[in-house]
């Protein structure tokens, strides 16, 4: 179980305490830092809708350090990012894998960024099958439909041919941020703003 840090701020009415995610939300920053599942996705969708309703012209920053997760839940976040009027910038700060990479490339054109030591990975995803033969047939069709949906989404954002995407996504396909930029998943790599101090 993770511990959520709290921030104490001085206001005109005294001290106010926020959990770190609520404080970031005040500055229109959303942090995607866990595997994607339905409850987490509902929270991210609600945050996007709130910030869009508050000011549809002001940018939302989404920081991503995500190993992936459930496809349906991830698509709910993706669709909401593309639905709202507020511009969304995405920044990878560690990993953006599987559905995490879909969210990373869903940022507005020119606003999809990654830090220099981050890693991005795309693949087809996986599904566990259980049930009798008719159920397995239905599930197999749905997995193929989801695969085609994801390939269409990657194609829309990268302009790469469907055949290349299908080939690359047959296995885990890892990229540095510079490779992801060439691939079309992101627009630029954020270089460090501070240089390390020279060793004595």
From Swiss-Prot:
GO terms for biological process: protein quality control for misfolded or incompletely synthesized proteins. Keywords: Cytoplasm, Hydrolase, Protease, Serine protease. Cleaves peptides in various proteins in a process that requires ATP hydrolysis. Has a chymotrypsin-like activity. Plays a major role in the degradation of misfolded proteins. Its EC number is 3.4.21.92. It is found in: Cytoplasm. One of its GO terms (molecular function) is serine-type endopeptidase activity. The gene is clpP. It is an enzyme of class 3 (hydrolase). Its main location: cytoplasm. GO terms for cellular component: cytoplasm; endopeptidase Clp complex. This is ATP-dependent Clp protease proteolytic subunit. InterPro entries: ClpP, ClpP/crotonase-like_dom_sf, ClpP/TepA. Fourteen ClpP subunits assemble into 2 heptameric rings which stack back to back to give a disk-like structure with a central cavity, resembling the structure of eukaryotic proteasomes. The active site is at residues 98, 123. Belongs to the peptidase S14 family. It catalyses: Hydrolysis of proteins to small peptides in the presence of ATP and magnesium. alpha-casein is the usual test substrate. In the absence of ATP, only oligopeptides shorter than five residues are hydrolyzed (such as succinyl-Leu-Tyr-|-NHMec, and Leu-Tyr-Leu-|-Tyr-Trp, in which cleavage of the -Tyr-|-Leu- and -Tyr-|-Trp bonds also occurs). The keyword Protease applies.
